[in-house]
Design a protein with these regions (language model features):
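S-adenosyl-L-methionine
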Residues: 1-16
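Conserved class I S-adenosyl-L-methionine
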Residues: 16-27
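Residues in the short beta-alpha loop(s) of Rossmann-like NAD(P)-binding domains
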Residues: 26, 47-49, 104
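Conserved SAM-binding loop of SAM-dependent methyltransferases across substrates and taxa
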Residues: 27-38
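Conserved S-adenosyl-L-methionine
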Residues: 36-42, 93-95
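A short acidic, Gly/Pro-enriched loop at the edge of an enzyme's catalytic core
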Residues: 65-73
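C-terminal substrate-binding/active-site "lid" region of AdoMet-derived donor-dependent transferases
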Residues: 81-130
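Adenosine-cofactor binding site in Rossmann-like domains, unifying the SAM/SAH pocket
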Residues: 45-66
Length: 130
C-alpha cells in the first residue's frame, strides 16, 4: 500500500523540481524515503515534535506559512482527525495540491471542503486540487 501511495505522489511530479512537504511525519518515513530518491523532487518534512534534525518543527494549527510558500504538493499520513481541517486550510492558503491518507476506514474531517476519495493500486486516500 505505501509503495502505491508513494508512486501516486510521484506521478504528480511534473515540474523539475517538484516541491513537496510531508506534514506530521512522526517516525514513519517509507513514503518520504521513496520520494526523496526521485531526481525531480525537493522534499521537506514537518512535525510539531521532530524526531531528528531533518524534520522542521512546525505546528500545523499555527503554521509558519513561509515554509509552505511555492510548494507543489502537501501530503500527510494518518493525521489525527482534529488536525485534518488545519492541514486542508494550509493547503488552500499555500495554493497547493493536497493528499491525506487517513487511518483505515476513517472518514476525513474536512468541514465544508470537498475532498475526492482516490483509489490507486493498493492505496486509498483523499485529494484536493489534484
Amino acid at each position: 500500500m505505501w509503495q502505491s501511495f508513494a508512486e501516486y505522489i510521484s506521478s504528480l511530479c511534473e515540474k523539475n523540481p517538484t516541491k513537496i512537504c510531508e506534514i506530521g511525519v512522526g517516525k514513519f518515513t517509507q513514503v518520504f524515503d521513496y520520494l526523496n530518491k526521485q531526481d525531480n523532487v525537493e522534499i521537506i518534512k514537518t512535525d510539531i515534535s521532530p524526531n531528528d534534525s531533518s524534520v522542521i518543527k512546525d505546528d500545523v494549527t499555527k503554521p509558519d506559512l513561509k515554509l509552505y510558500k511555492n510548494l507543489d504538493i502537501i501530503y500527510s499520513i494518518r493525521p489525527p482527525s482534529e488536525l485534518q481541517p488545519h492541514i486542508i486550510d494550509l493547503a488552500l492558503k499555500a495554493n497547493t495540491k493536497l493528499i491525506i491518507k487517513p487511518l483505515f476506514n476513517e472518514d476525513i474531517n474536512s468541514k465544508n471542503v470537498k475532498l475526492t476519495l482516490k483509489n490507486y493500486n493498493k492505496a486509498s486516500f483523499y485529494t484536493l486540487g489534484v
